[in-house]
Amino acid sequence: MNFQRMIDAFDMFNSLNLAQGVTPYIHLEKRRPEGTDNLYGLLHAIKNRYQVKFSYEKYYESEVTKRTLNPYGLKEFRYRWYVLGKENGEGIVKTFALDRLKDLDVTQTKFAFPKDYNIEESFRHSFGIIGPNKPHPEEIILSFNAIQGKYIKSLALHHDQEILVN
């Protein structure tokens, strides 16, 4: 979460707190991301460079697997939280959805954070948690009718989005 989003959330919280009696007039989305109960433990592990162990269930596999991870950071995308890191012996950074992560154990085993890893940079060309499988992204041109175009202009699909024809 970047600093501006934190400030925006704080401003919204303060506005709602100060405006007494407005609850009947405001309807917020009721969904709460699953797995947020592990945020504190994961943040503690990331900050202190502790390995974590957990059980993980993929949606497309019925078997629950045991994982050991060197956690590098957290990412939020569309009300879902993910932990990023490398598993023991693996060479690539993987993402694990917190809503499918169970039995979190923050170990006392330390790991070295790679000096060349940058979370922001690793997701620069991605959409959510899905990154390109090529070194450079491809250019994609989308076309919308005038009404849908207004929505796309007001809430970009991607931070690199450009408007070619207005």
Predicted features and spans:
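Surface-exposed, charged, gly/pro-rich loop-and-adjacent secondary-structure segments at domain edges
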Residues: 84-166
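Generic hydrophobic, helix-prone segments enriched in Leu/Val/Ile
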Residues: 10, 42, 46, 59, ...
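Short, charged N-terminal helix-start/capping segments
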Residues: 1-15, 69-72, 109-111, 116
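Short beta-strand-initiation
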Residues: 37, 64-70, 91, 137, ...
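Loop-centered beta-sheet repeat module
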Residues: 43-87
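Short, solvent-exposed secondary-structure boundary motifs
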Residues: 33-34, 58-67, 94, 121, ...
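Generic structural signal for residues positioned in beta-strands
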Residues: 24-25, 53, 73, 100-103, ...
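Bulky hydrophobic/aromatic content
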Residues: 1-57
